[in-house]
Structure formats: C-alpha cells, structure tokens
Swiss-Prot record:
This protein's name: Cytochrome b
An example Gene Ontology CC term for this record: mitochondrial inner membrane
Subcellular localization(s) per the UniProt record: Mitochondrion inner membrane
Function recorded in the entry: Component of the ubiquinol-cytochrome c reductase complex (complex III or cytochrome b-c1 complex) that is part of the mitochondrial respiratory chain. The b-c1 complex mediates electron transfer from ubiquinol to cytochrome c. Contributes to the generation of a proton gradient across the mitochondrial membrane that is then used for ATP synthesis.
C-alpha cells in the first residue's frame, strides 16, 4: 500500500505534471541540475568512504584516493568536474529566468536564490577539503572576512576556525558542514519544486492558459533525456580530456604555513564576487557588496506579473541584460588575474558598472510595474 501511494505521488508530481506546450531547451536546465546533483551525492558518498583527516589534514587522503584506491581518480574527477558543471548550469538557469521574466513567480524565485546561496556555501566548503595550499589560504582569507562584522566578527571567526588560527579542527568542521549543506540542498530542491508545481511553470511567451498544456511525460521527458545525454558528454569531456583545466596548480602543493601563494583566488564560479570584494578598499564594505552582488536578485521579484512579462520583451531590457552579462564575464576574468595594472583598474570599473546596471534594471522594473 505504501508503495502504491509513493508511486502515485511520484507519477502526479513528475509524469502527469501540466506543462506549457511551448517550452524550449532553456527550460531543461532544472532537470540537468537535478541529474548533476544526484551524481554529486553518489560520488561524494563514495569519496567520503576513503577520505580521512589526520594531524596533517586531508592532503594525504586525496593522494591515497588518486593513486591507491581502485577507480578513485575517476570518482574524484567526477566530483570536482561536477561542481563546475553544476554552478555553470545554475548560472544559465538564473539567466533564463532573467530573460523570460521568471522572477515574477516570487516564491519560486526567492527559493531559488536561497538555494543558490546554499549551493555556493557547499561548493566553498568542498573546495577546502583537499587541504592544498590554495584551499587553505583561500579558506583563511574568506573566513577572516567575517571579522569585519561589528562586535561578533572576531568571535565568529574563532568559532569557525576552532582556535586562534585555521587548522585541522577547521577542516573537521568544514567536512561536517559540507555534508550537512548537501542534505539541506535536497530539502530546498523539494521546496523549490513544490512551489513551482503549485503555481505552474512559466513559458517563453509569458502567457498563462491552463488549456494550452500537456502532461510532462512522454514529450518533455524525452526532451530532458536528450539533455541528459549532453550532461553525460560534458562529464566525459571534463573527466577524460581536461580533468585539471579548472583545478588550480597551487592546490596540488602541500600547505606551507610560513608562505602564502603569490596570488590567492577561489574557484572560477566565485571570481566575479571575489573581484568585487578586492576592488573595495573597506573590508566591511567589500563583504556587504559581495553579498549584495547576489542578493539584489531578490528585488526583481517585487512587482506584478503583467509588468514583468511586458518588460522582458522590450529592447531596453535585452540591452541591459546583455550588458550585465558582459560585465559579469569581465569580472570573472579579471578576478583570476593578479592585482596589478591594468587588471585592478578594469576590476574597479566593471564592479561599478555591475551595480550601476543592476540599479538601472531595478528602476526599469519598478517603472513598468508602476505603469502596468
């Protein structure tokens, strides 16, 4: 009986879901994220069986996984490449929402932004676990930014570190938090899907007619199957062709507590906010701007459906969105360079442009919602 109830729930939740007939491949990113997340959970579980933390950290366990465990290199590359694919497709998923005005579905949009924050936190914690030179010093720099919080900042940093400096106890905490946040992601994915299915999916035209819908299976499930083939190909390419492309070479060095790397940088999907952070002379101001760089997406959800649908069809919105995407790419590239001329100037200018275009987009959105 329980199996029949579970089967009918899954069937109604996924297969018989009413779906607009004009969805294109831009709407397949959510399914791709679900597949990659499942692969990340399985590969992460296998890696946790062989990952250990000793007095020198987790660097030796990574060498053990890569050299002594049968197929360990394969699982490790699946997990390390999967997070880059996951964040890249998540950014495309957000871009699709900006293009087609999906932010008018406020509950779904807000749950997605919260999910983005949790995924970024989990990705950062996982980046620290190899305990290489770049992982350690990057973690030290990022966590030390919390000391900019008035009154409680220093105590918060020492609590996270487990002492007056980052060490093995910090790594133990990060491993636990990485595991917990992965489970939280699963919960918020379910919340995101429930909210999406409650209000219904948007479509490229922005029209809402319940009669112009098909069940998700078999037409759209077949389309998602083709998307899954693309995901498998991307995994194959990243694992067997360029597994080290997105990994920093300095992270293959064991930690030297007496010497920092000449240029500390995070993973590529954090480079745009890292560039904004280092372009701000104030530590507290940099932390605030770094958070606001993503949190400002929340304000796009404040408005009416009609105004948002009409706004995203205008030429001005498309020009602003294209400019915003270009600035985002430039910030990502500049964040990977050292702080020297002309990269520092380009980073400062594009950081200002990033928020300027954001404010213009918000004002344009408020104007449309006021008129319509």
């Amino acid at each position: 009986m329980f199996f029949n109830i579970f089967k009918s729930s899954i069937k109604g939740f996924l297969l018989n879901l009413p779906t607009p007939i004009n969805l294109n491949y831009w709407y397949g990113f959510g399914s791709m994220l679900g597949l990659i997340y499942s692969i990340q959970i399985i590969s992460g579980l296998i890696l946790s069986w062989f990952y250990f933390i000793d007095l020198s950290g987790g660097f030796k366990s990574l060498i053990l996984i890569m050299q002594d465990v049968w197929g360990g290199w394969f699982i490790r590359f699946i997990h390390s490449s999967g997070v880059s694919l996951f964040m890249f497709i998540m950014y495309l998923h957000i871009l699709r929402g900006l293009i087609y005005g999906s932010f008018c579905k406020v509950d779904v949009w807000y749950s997605g932004i919260l999910l983005l924050f949790i995924c970024m936190g989990s990705a950062f914690l996982g980046y620290v676990l190899p305990w290489g030179s770049m992982s350690y010093w990057g973690m030290t720099v990022v966590t030390n930014m919390l000391s900019a919080i008035p009154m409680v900042g220093v105590y918060l940093v020492e609590t996270i570190w487990g002492g007056s400096s980052a060490g093995v106890s910090t790594l133990v905490r990060f491993f636990s938090f990485h595991y917990l946040l992965s489970l939280f992601i699963m919960v918020f994915i379910l919340i995101h899907l429930i909210l999406l299915h409650e209000c219904g999916s948007s479509n490229p035209l922005g029209v809402y007619y319940s009669c112009e819908k098909f069940t998700f299976h078999p037409l759209f499930s077949l389309k998602d199957t083709l998307v899954f083939v693309l995901v498998v190909f991307l995994y194959w390419f990243c694992i067997f062709v360029c597994p080290y492309l997105l990994l920093d070479a300095i992270n293959f060095e064991e930690i030297n507590f007496m010497m920092t790397p000449s240029h500390i940088k995070p993973e590529w999907y954090f480079l745009f906010i890292y560039c904004i952070l280092r372009s701000t002379p104030s530590k507290l101001g940099g932390v605030i701007l770094m958070v606001m760089a993503i949190l400002m997406l929340v304000f796009l959800g404040i408005g009416k459906n009609l105004g948002s649908v009409l706004m995203v069809k205008t030429l001005y919105w498309k020009l602003m969105l294209s400019s915003f995407l270009l600035v985002f790419i430039i910030l990502t590239i500049m964040g990977g360079y050292t702080v020297e001329y002309p990269y520092d100037i380009l980073g400062n200018v594009n950081s200002v442009l990033y928020f300027f275009i954001y404010v213009i987009m918000l004002l344009y959105s408020f104007m449309f919602n006021f008129v319509y």
